[in-house]
Structures are given as C-alpha cells and as structure tokens.
From Swiss-Prot:
Organism: Dictyostelium discoideum
Comp. bias regions, Polar residues: 223-234
Designated gene of the protein: bzpG
GO biological process, one term: protein kinase A signaling
Gene Ontology molecular functions: DNA binding; DNA-binding transcription factor activity
Protein name from the UniProt record: Probable basic-leucine zipper transcription factor G
Region listing for Leucine-zipper, in residue ranges: 305-340
C-alpha cells in the first residue's frame, strides 16, 4: 500500500512564521557582521589614520611624497571597501530571494487548498469463478494440464465416444426429430382443446367451474402419462427398426442380421428408406465377412507357404550334407583304387590274374550282344 500525504492549510501559517523568523535572524547576523567590520576599520593604528588625514588636508603631490607604508595602508582600505560592497550585494540578493519565497508561501496560503491523504491500492481483477485459490495481483494461476493416455487410447479405438449422434445413420436422426415434432404438435393441440374447454366452463357458475376445472387436468395428466408410456415403448424399437450401431455392425454376422430384420418386420412394417438402410447394412456385413474370409485365406496360404519353405530349406541342408559326405567317400575310394593298380602293376602274378578275370568278364558280354 502506498500513501501520499499533503500538509493541510492549518500548518502553513506556522511554517510561514518560522521562515520569517529565520530570515530576520539571518539579516540581524549580517548587520552585526557589518558593524564589526566598521569598528575594526575605525580602531586601526596611526599609520592607517595618517593617509586619511593626508587625503583630506594635503594635495596629490604631498600624498605621493609620503612613505610606502601609508600607500600600502591606503590600498588595504580600498580592499575593505570592496569587501563591504560585495557583502552588501550578497545580503541584498539573499533578502530578495527570501522575499520571493515569502510571496510564494503567501500565495499558496491565500488559495486555501486543503489536501486530504489518499491511498493507492492495487485493482483486483473481478472474477465470477468459484476458484478457492488466492491469486495475487498480476499473477496468473497456471494449472498444469495432463493428458490421460487411457482416454486417448479409448478415443483411438472407439470414435463413437466423441458424439453418440454421429454413430447413428442420418435417417434415424431425421425420423426421431420428426417423431418428436409430431408428439409436440399433438401435445399442443391437446392443450389448446383443454384451454377452450376451460374458457367455456368459465361462463357457468362457480361450483360448475370448480368441478369442470378438475376434469381437464385429469385429461392432461392421462395424456402425458400415455405419451410417456408410448415413448418408453418406442425407445427400444428405435434401435431395432432403424438400423444398427457401429459396434453392432462390427460384431453382427449375416445370420444375426437376418434374425434382426425378421424381428423388425414383426414389430413394425418397414418403410422403403428403412429397407434400403437395412440392405445397406447387410451389404456392409457381407463385405466385412468376405474381407475377413479373404484375409483369413491369405493368412492360411502364407502360413502354409512359410512351413513349406522351412521344410524345403531343411531338406536342402540335409541333401547338401549327404553330398559333401559322398564326395569325401568317392575321393577315398579313388585313392584306394589307384593304390590297387599300383600293387597289381608291381606284381606279375596279380597282373596275369587281373587280365584273365577281365577276359572272362568280357566274354559273356559279347555273347549277350550277339544274341540281341
């Protein structure tokens, strides 16, 4: 809080008196100083008085014939006169300034302006909110805003949470609005009839008016009750006759949809718009099922191909292993055969037996060739 105070008018004369007293004291001090200086000049030595006598009783030539001391003292006297003149000028200037100050103070006192103290308080913002937190002036209450990850995931999964009317078809909304308008019109007509009955009954006696005034109230209550029961009866049929929600479209099958249509036909004769809507929903369900089946077949085919590739890759690995082992065995056998040929060539007996065996083995081959 900042407070500003101005002096009232009653205290101003006291200040003026104090200032005038200060001015008088300063002027008295200046006069005492001047008188002291004059006394000092009058009570000087003989050497100081001689030049005055010479100045008054002698000529200029006699004055010049005096000693140097007298000339020096004359110069001191002139200097003192200059000092006195400067002091008088300063006193006059200070007195003039003090008179100007006194004039301004008198002018202010003549205006008679009384100033009262006032307070400077900060302006608080007017808020109609029911916030219990104490907010300071010029400070913004910044509440931390945190997003809920669970709610974001729910919105990503089900967009129908945003607005339930968006999940319903366009025809359902129009039909519901039309039904509500019709019900409101019927209620207005009933109220108008009741008002006309009341106006007619006012022309009769007071007792008759009291008796008749109770009957339309009963009629209105019965009409309202009947309307409420009718709405309660129609509320479950709206979802059964006008179509399915988005969740139901994602969960229903063709058999469920056929049963749903049968129940709707049993409850109410469907209009052309409703039939088109149900056909559209059937087509959507069939497309969803066919797409699901095609995806399932593709998935099964892909899984079969993956298993087949795995089997073939394992078989190829086994075959490569057997080939490598057979190649090694073939190399070993070739080495053994080469060693046997060397042994046979080294021994003549073995070479003779080898040639006989070879000749005997070639004769039956020739016989078979001749028979063919």
């Amino acid at each position: 809080m900042l407070s500003v105070w101005n002096l009232p008018v009653e205290q101003q004369p006291q200040q003026q008196q104090q200032q005038q007293q200060n001015i008088i004291n300063s002027s008295n001090n200046i006069n005492s100083i001047n008188s002291a200086l004059d006394n000092i000049l009058n009570t000087t030595s003989k050497g100081i008085q001689l030049p005055r006598f010479n100045l008054l009783n002698t000529s200029s030539s006699g004055f010049l014939t005096n000693s140097n001391d007298t000339l020096f003292l004359e110069n001191n006297n002139n200097n003192n006169n200059n000092i006195n003149q400067q002091l008088n000028k300063s006193v006059l200037n200070s007195s003039n300034k003090q008179l100007d100050i006194i004039k301004t103070i008198n002018e202010i006192s003549n205006e008679h302006k009384s100033f009262q103290p006032f307070e400077i308080t900060p302006i608080k913002p007017q808020s109609t909110s029911t916030n219990t937190y104490n907010t300071e002036f010029g400070v913004i209450n910044q509440n931390t805003f945190v997003l809920d990850s669970n709610k974001i995931e729910e919105l990503r999964v089900d967009t129908s949470v945003l607005d339930p009317l968006l999940s319903l078809p366009y025809n359902i909304i129009n039909n519901t609005t039309n039904n509500n308008n019709n019900n409101n019109n019927n209620n207005n007509n009933n109220n108008n009839n009741n008002n006309s009955n009341n106006n007619n009954s006012n022309n009769n006696n007071i007792n008759n008016n009291n008796n008749k005034s109770n009957t339309p109230m009963k009629k209105e209550s019965t009409i309202r009750n009947s309307n409420s029961t009718f709405e309660k009866f129609e509320s479950p049929t709206l979802s059964t006759t006008f179509g399915l929600n988005k969740e139901e479209l994602n969960t229903f099958t063709t058999t469920d949809m056929n049963n749903y249509v049968k129940q709707a036909n049993m409850v109410k004769e469907l209009s052309q718009v409703e039939k088109k809507e149900l056909k559209r929903q059937k087509r959507l369900i069939k497309n969803r099922e066919s797409a699901h089946l095609s995806r399932q077949r593709k998935r099964e085919r892909l899984t079969d191909l993956e298993h087949r590739v795995e089997e073939l890759s394992s078989n190829s690995i086994d075959i490569n292993k057997t080939l490598s082992s057979l190649e090694n065995e073939n190399l070993i056998l070739k080495a053994e055969v080469g060693q046997l040929f060397e042994v046979i060539n080294d021994s003549p007996v073995l070479s003779a037996l080898f040639y006989k065996i070879a000749s005997l083995s070639q004769q039956p081959q020739k016989d078979t060739i001749g028979a063919y």
